[in-house]
Every structure is written in C-alpha cells, then in structure tokens.
C-alpha cells in the first residue's frame, strides 16, 4: 500500500501529533484455516510492517496484548501526518491477512499541552514570592524564573512530541472531555 497524496496534501498540525489507539479481535476460526507456513508468513509480514512504521520519521508505534475479552491485540500510533496515520491503520488491519484482524474499537486524538499549565507569572507569585519569600526582579528570583521556563519548555515539548517507551503494560482510558 503506497501513499496516493503529495507532500502538499499532508495534514500536519501546527503543534503536536495525531494519536490513534487501535484495538483488534483475532478471528481464530479464520486464523486456523491458514497453514503453518501461511501463519508464519503473516506473523513475519506483521513484524516487518511494525518495523517499517517504527522507522518512519516523526512516528512511533507500540504494540500490545489486550487483557480483556473486548480485543486481543492493540496498537498505539503517534505520527505527525493524518494521511500517514490512516495509511498505517489500513496496513495494520490487513497485515495478518484478510479477515484475520477485526477492529473492535479505535480512538483518534492529538497530543496537547492542556489548559492547566502554570505560567511564569503564577510560579513567580505563588511559589517564589509566597512560598520561598523571594523578591521580584532579584538575581535569585530571575534565575528561578529562567530555570522554570527551561523546565516548562522541555515539559511542553515532551507533551506534544512524547518519546513513548515500549513498555509491556500500559493503561488506556478514553477521554470524554468535550473540546471547544
């Protein structure tokens, strides 16, 4: 499966990445019809596809087993281009062969900073002045604000462009928050 769009058609947000959680049930009846050689080839094809996706710039893919009867296997895909995410989703769905993986549910979201981040002014007033007793515009106060700003720059970047570890277990829950 190849891209049928140009770089000009990419859907890349101003900040952050697209995130897709994909959950599949394995049709064990369909899987059992395949010979051992066909099953091995299908597993090899899926492994190669995962490696190919993981080697794509600005893209991460986590794969995991689901511990409930709602699904058997899942993927968490983070990437900058929505068209690329859509292509990867289609490729993953058919990677083991037609009708082997049945989507049970999926979620599309984006990484974001959130509306609850402390501003330098709030940090200065609430922490530096009230808690630590520092006076505004002193060297110690300004150094602390500079450190806070460096920390928040890294924090913001990590939220928008996370580096997800390939952990054997993670918790997922869908967010029901309405966005404006």
PLM regions: where:
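A short linear-motif detector with a strong N-terminal bias
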Residues: 1-3, 42, 52-56, 83-87, ...
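An N-terminus-focused feature that recognizes amino-terminal "leader" regions
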Residues: 2-65
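N-terminal, charge-rich interaction modules
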Residues: 3-23, 145-180
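Long compositionally biased, domain-poor regions of proteins
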Residues: 9, 45-61, 78, 82-84, ...
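Hydrophobic, ordered structural segments
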Residues: 27, 63-165
């Amino acid at each position: 499966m190849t891209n049928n769009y140009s770089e000009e058609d990419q859907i890349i947000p101003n900040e952050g990445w697209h995130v897709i959680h994909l959950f599949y049930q394995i049709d064990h009846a369909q899987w059992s019809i395949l010979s051992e050689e066909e099953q091995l080839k299908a597993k090899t094809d899926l492994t190669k596809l995962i490696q190919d996706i993981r080697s794509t710039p600005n893209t991460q893919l986590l794969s995991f087993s689901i511990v409930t009867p709602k699904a058997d296997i899942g993927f968490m895909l983070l990437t900058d281009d929505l068209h690329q995410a859509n292509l990867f989703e289609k490729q993953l769905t058919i990677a083991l062969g037609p009708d082997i993986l049945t989507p049970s549910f999926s979620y599309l979201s984006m990484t974001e900073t959130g509306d609850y981040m402390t501003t330098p002014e709030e940090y200065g007033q609430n922490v530096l002045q009230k808690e630590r007793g520092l006076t505004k515009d002193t060297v110690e106060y300004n150094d602390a604000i500079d450190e806070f700003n460096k920390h928040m720059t890294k924090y913001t970047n990590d939220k928008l462009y996370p580096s997800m570890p390939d952990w054997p277990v993670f918790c997922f829950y869908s967010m029901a928050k309405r966005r404006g």
